[in-house]
């Protein structure tokens, strides 16, 4: 499978993570878990809270990436992007606001609220926000990562409330089709 995927994508190496954070709705899309910022530079989701619903996946993904190399055998530089401090759950009012025949997630299940599912534009990042205390930290962390990687001021990271999007089973990166100008 790996060789076929490498040929199909025209890449020299694929790095596999064991499990994403949403096996039920999206089959664990990688855009909720990790993203390459530049060649050899990757960010992944992180929490220190062992009671967080996706604690195990965060740590497994981080371990996979810090032990991985790029196609030329070089170690990756891995940044940690925090998860929301509190898992995101849908209220009854929010559940009733979604016009779906079969809602994607139940109210008692944690939503796949990850700051990683952000949109990169030509010189900016649009970062999901959930009304959580870590919202500002996520934007600041991504801004720092992009400044360190590409130079200060090349990218501008901003937050946008995306709770209604996440309740439908995706987020900003999922619902957009990125096409850079160059």
Residue spans for each PLM region:
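Histidine/cysteine-enriched polar flanking segments
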Residues: 1-182
